[in-house]
Design a protein with these regions (language model features):
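Bacterial Sec-dependent N-terminal signal peptides
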Residues: 1-26
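Short coil/turn linking the two alpha-helices of tandem helical-hairpin repeats
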Residues: 35-38, 71-80, 116-121, 162
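Helix-turn-helix repeat elements of alpha-solenoid scaffolds
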Residues: 35-48, 82-90, 123, 127-131
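Canonical positions in the second alpha-helix
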Residues: 50-51, 89, 96, 134
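Structural register within alpha-helical repeat arrays
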Residues: 65, 72, 110, 154-158
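Terminal, low-structured helical/coil segments at or just beyond the last alpha-helical repeat
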Residues: 134-177
Length: 177
C-alpha cells in the first residue's frame, strides 16, 4: 500500500512540476520562433516572453535572446521603447559574440538587426565585421557548425537587396551548400 502511494505521489509530482526548460531553447525551435516573430506581432511577444526567461550563457541562444529584443522594437510604437529594445539587443549580442566570436549564426542575427537600424542612430557599427564572419563561415560549411538549411537561409538573405557588394555576392553564389 505504501509503495502504491509512493508511485502515485511520484506520478503526481512529475505531472505537476514544470518540465526541464532546455527543450524550449533548442536551436531548431528558436530559428522557427524567430522567423514567426519577425512576421507577426503576437508571435514576437510570445518569443520575447520566452527568451526573457532565458538566463544561461549558450552563445547562440543568447543571440536569439538579443534578436527577441530587437524584434520587439519593430512592433513598439514608442520611440523611447524602440531604442531601449535595440540597445538591450546590442548588449546581448555583444555578450554572445564575446562567448563565440567566430560563429556565423550569431553574426548573422546581429547583422540582420543592425542592417535595419536607421544609420543616423549610429548603432550599426558591426556590419562589415559581421558580414566577413558570415561569408567565411559559409565558405567553411559544412564545417561551420551550422545545419545546411540554416546556411542556405543565411546565404539567400545575404544575396538579397544591398546586403553585400557584387563581388561578395559572386563569392556567395559559388558556395555549394
Amino acid at each position: 500500500m505504501i509503495t502504491f502511494l509512493l508511485f502515485l505521489l511520484l506520478g503526481f509530482v512529475t505531472n505537476v512540476l514544470p518540465a526541464d526548460n532546455t527543450k524550449a531553447y533548442t536551436l531548431t525551435t528558436l530559428r522557427k520562433d524567430y522567423l514567426k516573430a519577425s512576421k507577426d506581432e503576437a508571435a514576437a511577444r510570445l518569443f520575447y516572453k520566452k527568451m526573457a526567461d532565458y538566463n544561461e550563457r549558450h552563445p547562440v541562444v543568447l543571440a536569439y535572446k538579443g534578436a527577441s529584443e530587437a524584434v520587439m522594437a519593430k512592433y513598439n510604437w514608442n520611440p523611447y521603447n524602440k531604442l531601449k529594445h535595440v540597445k538591450t539587443a546590442g548588449s546581448i549580442f555583444k555578450e554572445a559574440v564575446a562567448l563565440d566570436n567566430a560563429n556565423p549564426e550569431i553574426r548573422f542575427l546581429r547583422f540582420t538587426v543592425e542592417h535595419y537600424i536607421p544609420r543616423y542612430l549610429n548603432l550599426s557599427e558591426h556590419l562589415k565585421e559581421d558580414k566577413g564572419v558570415i561569408i567565411e563561415g559559409l565558405k567553411k560549411h559544412p564545417h561551420s557548425g551550422m545545419p545546411t538549411d540554416m546556411a542556405k537561409t543565411i546565404r539567400d538573405f545575404m544575396l538579397t537587396k544591398d546586403h553585400c557588394t557584387e563581388a561578395e555576392k559572386e563569392v556567395l553564389r559559388n558556395i555549394v551548400l
